[in-house]
Amino acid sequence: KFYQDRLVMIAPVNDYFLEMKDTGSFSLEEVLQEQPVILREQGSGTGKSASAFLEKIGISEDKLHIAARINDQEAIKNLVAGGLGVSIVSEKAVHDYIDAKRLLQFELPGHIAGREFYIIYHKEYILKDYVCEFIRYLEHCYKQ
């Protein structure tokens, strides 16, 4: 395992969600079923993780008001920041918008919203220098 990521719910910075964030009291299920939801396309890793998360908390996608399925993480961040809905995304993918206060981040239950990334290779093969360099680069970029 070289990196552990987790999913978070992102929402626009507006009075409704700011109050939710300030009080800390909100029902994730209600928010996801009442607000428009912008999801990644179904074939993406994040899309699969979000679907698995929803299934684990007992929400089927047909109960959501899915406003769009988008294949671009930047587009999702911009749509949510523009007030067009909420989304479930990788925490790493949105830290820039969170830091810039363009989005609000809501934590999801960690034990079911996490995912792990591995570098897999055959242990009996001698890796080329450029492959070893790439692995070191990944480990450096995703240092926890």
Which ranges hold each PLM region?
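Hydrophobic hinge/microswitch elements
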Residues: 51-55, 59-104
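Flexible hinge/capping segments at coil-to-helix
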Residues: 2-38, 42
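Alpha-helical segments flanking ligand/cofactor-binding loops in enzyme cores
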Residues: 28-30, 77-78, 132
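A late-sequence structural motif
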Residues: 104-144
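Secondary-structure junction motif
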Residues: 28, 36-58, 128-129
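Structured helix-beta-strand junction loops
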Residues: 5, 33-35, 82-83, 100-101, ...
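Short beta-strand->loop
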Residues: 1-8, 65, 99-113
